[in-house]
Amino acid sequence: LGEDFVCFGDCSLAAVVYRELRALDRTLAVAESCTGGLLGDAFTNVPGASKAFLGGVICYSNDVKVALLGVPDSLLEQHGAVSAECAIAMATGSAERLSADYGLSITGFAGPEGGNKDNPLGTIHIGYHSPVGVWCKTVRYTGGRLDVKARAVHAALDWMRRKIRKYKFEEFLNYSATD
């Protein structure tokens, strides 16, 4: 199954990400706009998660993105709140403001209103800040608002799981090469 394998038995993606973070002795902070706290909720459902999950910011308004996460006004004016640039700034801001190793963010148009030609309804930008760099993944979903929000959280968790496993594998290769 390779990287598509998550775990044996009954487990959540948040629990898998938590275990990966604990194995690395790393911490995570999140920033959420359109998901309104669902990503943080997924982590707080994992017993003992506070050992790796530090907390998050629900930043539905641009003012909160600026004030609490340090997203520049100029970035919001140039790219908008639903953009790859904003997602990365949110992830970085959450990690920096909460002193976490990793930051994960979600911003998008969950519907039924909003959207534009560049970012139609269902567009979700997931920001990822790590010790080795920053990235953004963009996904698009159809369906109702609650479905889009749930799928966005699932996508963010799965992407982070894959990124951490790739990082661990690369660290292993680097360590093995110096042995």
Feature locations, PLM:
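Short alpha-helical segments enriched in small residues
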Residues: 1-179
